[in-house]
């Protein structure tokens, strides 16, 4: 690169600056994520366009033909004998990134597609009864050819 007149450090700096700007624009279009704060993690969402989706699957095969952010929720029942114990939670692969919450608390995040996710619900969060898992799944599409 240097022999062609490019300065690697400046190109890397430019890349990171433009990627940060792109991601800020991307996040600004997510109604569930305002000013860096997730909005839909504390309670099971109903109405307001929330529809069931059979998973696992690429959401494009379920009628959502776009790249961007999709929020998923699932109400689960924590058995009494699991109460107060750490629980391992496994997700299938997500294309591309996720942030996962349990009862409003972030329990994990992973960047990159084709990566299995294993998160832990802490013993303090594991209480008998109903709980809500919320996943912010982000599919960036092809970053080189799209706008946010």
Where is each model-derived feature located?
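Short, surface-exposed tryptophan/glycine-enriched loops
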Residues: 118-132, 136
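Short beta-strands within extracellular/lumenal beta-sheet-rich domains
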Residues: 66-79
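Short strand-edge motifs at loop-to-beta-strand transitions and within beta-strands
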Residues: 72-74, 115-119
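Edge strands and adjacent loops of beta-rich recognition modules
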Residues: 47-67
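Short hydrophobic beta-strand segments in globular cytosolic domains
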Residues: 107-108
